[in-house]
């Protein structure tokens, strides 16, 4: 029935595409795909071929030249011409797609193309443009999660997508009621890279029929591939624009080409404004009647970030101007259609009265302004506008200025940029999973709070009540006690926004004193300086002391083995920024104290918590909160905001302004109580399927196992959210399940996962199990604190001279092994148990326990290799050599293994697969622990 249901859906899709003008073709294998491609190449290049279609040898040369490339190189080739040497030694210039006149391509659709490479697979629906498979659609019946279609495509990408299938640009996955699209890649693709399509009003187009009508309409899909994908030349991967990015770029292009008016794009922080602005700049710079596109940024710390991003999208597409003289030189160069510079340098260039500037007075110049809500642009806009008489200005902002939050000169964003051309609000981005929501908690930090007038509280920024030693220490202790809950045991990092530089120094010194007293072992850093881009009006209490900053930098140098001081502040800034982005355990900043720096324009997926002891409102509040809400893995459900001031009113007001709604629930997470109720409801589903962990083993039917996996996965997802709250306690009274019972269920869940993984590796056939494409989200189960290194450290601590202490430590390690979720530790668990029970009790007091363990491990490894070799009638010596080679180089010589098996083909192939699997598992199990 499942097959029939999906088959019927497949036919609906084919019929609809046919109605939209696609030619339905019967292509069901690679040979037919090649024949069709050859026919279309001949058709599209009829004039160039002069009545002489490609010969077999010519087509073979063409296929040799364009086949076997990576996804990235195939994407580059698709967008370039190809020079084919004909049999008569003349050159033939071929192109594979009309990138400018999108409708003038040939559109075909087929289904059930069967590919047999390492494994046999059949693809649901394939869209061919000019004979190349550019869009692959994978369908699931209603009620099945589309992540299963995603996982199936991932399997195909690993096993079968070779040859012309490397030209696939976009994947579409759907279960009829929910549909998403995403770009192909040579890399691992994450589920967060699947996008919803929507209309201009940001209303999702989920229903497959509507999606096909809008997104897969032939001219649109061709335009999407031609115009709204970016081939990232630095990191070598494809990017597809999201719908709101497409609409924003189109709105800017229409405004620039059809009017002389300005406009701004309001896209929430974290939604990819840099990519949108790059694509708009790139397309505008290709227009003949536009003399120059100038991208203006505000601060030096953003210059390098924007430049790096732009040059990632297209290598060497921009050359940043680091001084006004260089800017003038670039303005004079007609071969540079796109320039990135600062507002300040452009203002200086205008003031210079240079002859180059005169030549631009009457020309059509486009200015694109990043973070256009900032006040500096308003100040310099008049000067620039007076000079460039025919310029147009397009601004990008996540937090525009309105009447409620207008700038100091009394102007709103619309006063400068006229009209909002497209908006994508924070509530839209959260709904689409493009950014995370916020979990906000408020902590009272002085007893007399309720007795103070609210207006008075807002005015006492640096008075004694906020800077009191007792209050500062209480906040530090509260933060320390909850740090691991908030940051997922240190897998993420945090920022602490405070009111002033004196407060930052006081907090820093308090954290350091508490660290010296043994209260915590967190790495705390701070960064501040007026010269490094703190706005003067936001820094009235500026008391910067170079000596204090040098002292703080010296602590930093001691911690991270660096060598910074105030003379090379930029190096310090870069290092801090890098450690906040590339979180490496034991080499990261746990808490970064800031005043204004890093609260705008700084992106880090590894930052998940913001502590706040600072008065924030309107755009400043949303900008600061948004540092935490970049999407990462499943273990980051939202951005944590911990306020040590009562910012409830300001938070609600800011959300209402920037979401254009009075419903803050669209942005804020549920309460602890609501998550707890959800947890208990899901727990009942788990109990119904398997009343005890042992009952999981009785679930023989795969459909029941699948139900258990989905229910327990949802339970774990909710548990991660609960664990971030201060009030969380893992007790049976609180949650309805004891922690050990939960761990036992988790063990059963991971057993099912490992069974499926083993089955996939050995069998590798499509549709072997309904569990094959389930999204297990094993990331949810991870506890980084209990891994092989941690257990080996505990083994090293066993006291062999005290039998009681020795057995207590053995018992402790046994308990930890029972709740192991680290993959390598689960592989080693039985080995370690055996060592603890059989070897440790017999060790002498002066034995080196670590040496004893590795000696035991080597013997067990040899036993396993010999036993497996005997079982498979394979040479133990050859198997041992293969294991050692794989351990050393990561390579397995499949051919050599096969040559040493005297069996018929199918048996030899299966045995080879089993031996390779054993080699991989053995190296993973006995591998060296870093």
UniProtKB/Swiss-Prot annotation:
Coiled coil: none annotated. The keyword Protein biosynthesis does not apply. It is an enzyme of class 3 (hydrolase). It catalyses: Endonucleolytic cleavage of DNA to give random double-stranded fragments with terminal 5'-phosphates, ATP is simultaneously hydrolyzed. One of its GO terms (molecular function) is ATP binding. Residues 254-418 form the Helicase ATP-binding domain. Its EC number is 3.1.21.3. GO terms for biological process: DNA restriction-modification system. Keywords: ATP-binding, DNA-binding, Endonuclease, Hydrolase, Nuclease, Nucleotide-binding, Restriction system. ATP binds at residues 268-274. The keyword Transmembrane does not apply. The restriction (R) subunit of a type I restriction enzyme that may recognize 5'-GAGN(7)TAC-3' and cleaves a random distance away. Subunit R is required for both nuclease and ATPase activities, but not for modification. After locating a non-methylated recognition site, the enzyme complex serves as a molecular motor that translocates DNA in an ATP-dependent manner until a collision occurs that triggers cleavage. This is Type I restriction enzyme SepRPIP endonuclease subunit. The lineage of its organism: Bacteria, Bacillati, Bacillota, Bacilli, Bacillales.
């Amino acid at each position: 029935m499942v097959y029939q249901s999906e088959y019927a859906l497949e036919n609906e899709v084919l019929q609809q595409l046919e109605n939209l003008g696609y030619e339905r073709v019967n292509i069901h294998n690679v040979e037919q795909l090649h024949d069709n491609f050859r026919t279309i190449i001949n058709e599209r290049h009829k004039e160039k071929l002069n009545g002489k279609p490609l010969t077999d040898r010519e087509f073979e040369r063409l296929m040799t030249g364009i086949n076997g490339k990576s996804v990235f190189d195939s994407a580059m080739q698709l967008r370039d011409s190809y020079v084919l040497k004909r049999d008569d030694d003349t050159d033939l210039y071929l192109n594979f797609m009309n990138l400018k006149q999108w409708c003038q391509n040939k559109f075909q659709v087929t289904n059930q193309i069967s590919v047999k490479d390492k494994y046999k697979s059949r693809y649901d629906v394939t869209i061919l443009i000019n004979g190349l498979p550019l869009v692959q659609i994978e369908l699931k019946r209603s009620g099945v999660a589309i992540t299963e279609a995603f996982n199936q495509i991932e399997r195909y990408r690993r096993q079968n997508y070779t040859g012309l299938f490397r030209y696939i640009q976009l994947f579409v996955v759907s279960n009829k009621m929910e549909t998403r699209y995403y770009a192909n890649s040579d890399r691992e693709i994450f589920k967060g890279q699947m996008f919803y399509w929507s209309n201009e009003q940001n209303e999702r187009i989920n229903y497959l029929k509507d999606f096909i009508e809008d997104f897969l309409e032939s001219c649109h899909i061709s335009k999407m591939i031609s115009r709204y994908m970016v081939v990232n030349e630095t990191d070598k991967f494809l990017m597809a624009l999201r719908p709101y990015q497409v609409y924003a770029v189109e709105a800017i292009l229409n405004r620039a080409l059809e009017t002389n008016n300005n406009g701004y794009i309001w896209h929430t922080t974290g939604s990819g404004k840099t990519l949108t602005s790059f694509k708009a700049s790139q397309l505008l710079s290709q227009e003949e009647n536009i003399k120059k596109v100038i991208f203006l940024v505000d601060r030096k710390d953003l210059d390098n970030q924007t430049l790096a991003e732009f040059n990632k999208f297209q290598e060497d597409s921009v050359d940043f101007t680091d001084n006004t003289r260089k800017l003038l030189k670039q303005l004079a160069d007609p071969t540079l259609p796109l320039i990135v510079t600062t507002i300040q340098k452009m203002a200086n260039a205008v003031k210079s009265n240079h002859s180059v500037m005169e030549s631009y007075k009457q020309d059509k110049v486009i200015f694109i302004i990043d973070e256009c809500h900032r006040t500096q642009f308003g100040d310099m806009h008049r000067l620039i506008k007076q000079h460039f008489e025919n310029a147009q200005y397009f601004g990008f902002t996540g937090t525009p200025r309105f009447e409620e939050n207008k700038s100091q000169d009394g102007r709103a964003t619309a006063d400068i940029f006229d009209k909002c051309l497209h908006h994508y609000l924070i509530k839209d981005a959260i709904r689409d999973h493009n950014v995370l929501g916020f979990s906000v908690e408020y902590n009272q930090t002085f007893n007399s709070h309720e007795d103070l007038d609210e207006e008075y509280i807002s005015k006492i920024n640096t008075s004694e009540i906020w800077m009191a030693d007792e209050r500062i220490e209480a906040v530090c202790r509260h933060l320390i006690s909850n740090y691991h809950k908030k940051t997922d045991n240190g897998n993420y990092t945090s920022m602490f926004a405070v009111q002033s530089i004196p407060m930052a120094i006081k907090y820093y010194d308090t954290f350091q004193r508490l660290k010296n007293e043994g209260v915590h072992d967190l790495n705390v850093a701070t960064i501040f300086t007026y010269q490094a881009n703190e706005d003067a009006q936001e820094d009235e209490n500026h008391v910067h002391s170079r000596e204090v900053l040098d002292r703080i930098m010296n602590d930093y140098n001691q911690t991270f083995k660096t060598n910074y001081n105030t003379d090379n502040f930029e190096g310090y800034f870069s290092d801090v920024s890098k450690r906040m982005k590339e979180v490496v355990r034991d080499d990261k900043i746990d808490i970064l104290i800031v005043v204004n720096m890093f609260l705008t324009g700084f992106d880090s997926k590894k930052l998940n918590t913001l502590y706040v002891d600072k008065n924030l409102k309107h755009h400043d509040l949303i900008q600061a909160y948004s540092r935490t809400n970049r999407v990462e893995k499943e273990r980051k459900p939202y951005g944590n905001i911990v306020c040590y001031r009562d910012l409830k009113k300001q938070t609600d007001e800011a959300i209402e302004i920037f979401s254009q709604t009075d419903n803050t629930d669209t942005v804020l997470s549920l309460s602890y109580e609501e998550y707890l109720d959800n947890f208990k409801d899901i727990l009942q589903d788990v109990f119904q399927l398997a009343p005890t962990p042992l009952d999981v083993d009785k679930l023989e039917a795969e459909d029941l196992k699948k139900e258990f996996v989905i229910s327990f996965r949802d339970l774990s997802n909710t548990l991660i959210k609960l664990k971030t709250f201060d009030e969380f306690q893992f007790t049976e009274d609180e949650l309805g399940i004891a922690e050990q019972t939960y761990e036992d269920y988790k063990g059963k869940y991971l057993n099912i996962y490992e069974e499926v993984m083993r089955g996939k590796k050995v069998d590798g056939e499509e549709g072997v199990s309904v569990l094959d494409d389930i999204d297990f989200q094993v990331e949810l189960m991870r506890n980084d604190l209990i891994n092989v290194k941690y257990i080996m450290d505990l083994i090293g601590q066993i006291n062999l001279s005290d039998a009681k202490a020795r057995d207590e430590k053995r018992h402790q390690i046994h308990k930890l092994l029972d709740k192991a979720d680290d993959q390598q530790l689960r592989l080693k668990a039985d080995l370690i148990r055996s060592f603890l029970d059989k070897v440790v009790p017999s060790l002498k007091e002066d034995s080196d326990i670590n040496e004893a363990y590795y000696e035991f491990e080597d013997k067990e490894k040899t036993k396993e290799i010999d036993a497996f070799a005997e079982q498979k009638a394979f040479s133990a010596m050859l198997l041992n050599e293969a294991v050692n080679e794989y351990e050393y180089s990561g390579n397995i010589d499949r051919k050599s293994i096969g040559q040493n098996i005297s069996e018929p083909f199918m048996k030899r192939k299966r045995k080879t697969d089993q031996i390779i699997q054993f080699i991989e598992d053995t190296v993973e199990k006995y591998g060296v622990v870093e």
